[in-house]
């Protein structure tokens, strides 16, 4: 499916130079002299290389056809992270590279969206918020309750999240999967 250069948005998957590229950032530029163009920062899905490319206003790009599928995370082993398709119950193993540092938000039975291109996984989308249990938290400092101070806490999945002073080990909290920030108690 062809789209105009001005319709390219972050998150789009483009077929460009015989590869699949995920759009990270777009900037519309209208210089004082010359034609308008779109500056696009992209990442190659297969190789992981980044590219800054300039597309003229009249150019059309090929947008990749992506099929989203809801899958459930089961477990991790030496081969990778195992997911089950909710429609046909087939299992799919994804590598850590494909999950792009999002493994710290995966708990068994978490539903995520796996994006497929020609029946091949090209990326995942986590739910915007997950509930994690605090495994370890630094002790709170007495008298620090008036200020909005934070302390680091290790979650059950191994990631570290900055939490308010009143959060203790054993409590469940809601964490934003986009930036890894504390939202509130669960």
Swiss-Prot record:
Transmembrane segments: none annotated. Its main location: cytoplasm. CDD domains: S1_EF-P_repeat_1, S1_EF-P_repeat_2. GO terms for biological process: peptide biosynthetic process. It is found in: Cytoplasm. Pfam families: EFP, EFP_N, Elong-fact-P_C. The modification N6-(3,6-diaminohexanoyl)-5-hydroxylysine is found at residue 33. Keywords: Cytoplasm, Elongation factor, Hydroxylation, Protein biosynthesis. Pathway: Protein biosynthesis; polypeptide chain elongation. GO terms for cellular component: cytoplasm. One of its GO terms (molecular function) is translation elongation factor activity. PROSITE patterns: EFP. May be beta-lysylated on the epsilon-amino group of Lys-33 by the combined action of EpmA and EpmB, and then hydroxylated on the C5 position of the same residue by EpmC (if this protein is present). Lysylation is critical for the stimulatory effect of EF-P on peptide-bond formation. The lysylation moiety may extend toward the peptidyltransferase center and stabilize the terminal 3-CCA end of the tRNA. Hydroxylation of the C5 position on Lys-33 may allow additional potential stabilizing hydrogen-bond interactions with the P-tRNA. Involved in peptide bond synthesis. Alleviates ribosome stalling that occurs when 3 or more consecutive Pro residues or the sequence PPG is present in a protein, possibly by augmenting the peptidyl transferase activity of the ribosome. Modification of Lys-33 is required for alleviation. Belongs to the elongation factor P family. This is Elongation factor P. The gene is efp.
